[in-house]
UniProtKB/Swiss-Prot annotation:
Pfam families: Ribosomal_L13. This protein is one of the early assembly proteins of the 50S ribosomal subunit, although it is not seen to bind rRNA by itself. It is important during the early stages of 50S assembly. It comes from Mycoplasmopsis agalactiae (strain NCTC 10123 / CIP 59.7 / PG2) (Mycoplasma agalactiae). Part of the 50S ribosomal subunit. This is Large ribosomal subunit protein uL13. InterPro entries: Ribosomal_uL13, Ribosomal_uL13_bac-type, Ribosomal_uL13_CS, Ribosomal_uL13_sf. GO terms for cellular component: cytosolic large ribosomal subunit. Keywords: Ribonucleoprotein, Ribosomal protein. One of its GO terms (biological process) is translation. Gene3D superfamilies: Ribosomal protein L13. It comes from the Bacteria. The keyword Nucleotide-binding does not apply. GO terms for molecular function: mRNA binding; structural constituent of ribosome.
Length: 144
């Protein structure tokens, strides 16, 4: 008789991966990375435990949008005060903080729970090709 193995976070074999975002479409990149962060690429996926791997995204400022989304896409946030709805286009956001577009896309694809917050901490987005996580010996990961 087969037994179902339940893997908890202590038994999770977490790896480090580095993903190059250069010339990658933001949405496709975000969907793939969110899947790796959640651990859905592993055969031992458990939905209620942090099973995902660590992901470093380099060249985040070189991720692309399709069509005219660079000028047309608008990001909104609210200050909490009446009339406090703020908006910024993708082009202005990229100029202000190059990593924010990729971070926001991935964060939106992760669960909005305590577990999702833990999984967000496993993501490291870097503008440029150099990162400070070489000591972890990350493996290269291609976006499917």
């Amino acid at each position: 008789m087969r037994q179902t193995t339940i893997v908890n976070r202590e038994k999770a074999n977490k790896k480090w991966f580095v993903v190059d975002a250069e010339n990658q479409v933001v949405g496709r990149l975000a969907a793939f990375v969110a899947s790796v962060l959640r651990g859905k690429t592993k055969p031992t996926f458990t939905p209620n435990a942090d099973m995902g791997d660590y992901v470093i995204i380099i060249n985040a400022e070189k991720a692309i949008f399709t069509a005219k989304k660079e000028e047309d896409k608008v990001y909104y946030h609210h200050s909490g005060y009446p009339g406090g709805l703020k908006s910024i286009t993708a082009a202005k956001l990229r100029a202000k903080k190059p990593t924010a577009i990729v971070e926001k896309a991935i964060y939106g694809m992760l669960p909005h729970t305590k577990l999702g917050n833990k999984q967000r901490r496993n993501l490291f987005v870097v503008a440029g090709s150099e990162h400070k996580y070489a000591a972890q010996k990350p493996e290269r990961l291609e976006v499917r």
